């Protein structure tokens, strides 16, 4: 499976984990066979996006970029078309085949010409490191009240007190 994440604006908010992006899963064998291969989509909340500042804002603040809220209408639709997703997946297959291993690929869609561009590719580390290790499965024995929702960053079940971190200095 090729796993693709996408959000609006510059990719830094996705990389930093500051935004919950859209997620797309593309089936490699179906894609290689020339068939429609998008097998699952998850709509992310995409609350914010990072954008370039105007020349006036740059002159006033000295900043090249800023973070702004994404309008509700945009949040409620996918940030990529199915055709874009499958094109990115085809690029991923070519890159993976060239390097002979799974790759973590950063891409961008130009806001002016609408074209997809590959920005960088590096060996994928998280999933490939897991190969050969025993897989542990966890099962919840019950369900409690949902206090907060977000994007999972791990695959285990945790318990204990919640600590809210307001800044990097904490």
Write out the residue ranges for each language-model feature:
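Non-catalytic, soluble scaffold/interaction modules
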Residues: 1-170
């Amino acid at each position: 499976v090729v796993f693709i994440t996408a959000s609006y604006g510059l990719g830094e908010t996705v990389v930093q984990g500051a935004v919950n992006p859209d997620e797309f899963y593309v089936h490699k064998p179906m894609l290689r066979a020339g068939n429609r291969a998008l097998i699952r989509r998850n709509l992310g909340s995409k609350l914010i996006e990072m954008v370039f500042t105007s020349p006036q804002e740059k002159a006033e603040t000295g900043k090249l970029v800023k973070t702004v809220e994404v309008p509700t209408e945009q949040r409620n639709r996918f940030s990529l078309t199915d055709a874009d997703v499958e094109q990115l997946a085809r690029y991923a297959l070519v890159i993976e085949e060239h390097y002979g291993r799974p790759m973590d690929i950063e891409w961008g869609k130009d806001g002016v010409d609408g074209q997809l561009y590959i920005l960088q590719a590096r060996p994928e580390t998280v999933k490939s490191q897991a190969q050969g290790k025993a897989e542990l499965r966890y099962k919840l024995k019950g369900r409690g009240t949902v206090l907060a929702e977000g994007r999972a960053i791990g695959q285990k079940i945790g318990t204990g007190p919640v600590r809210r971190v307001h800044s990097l200095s904490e």
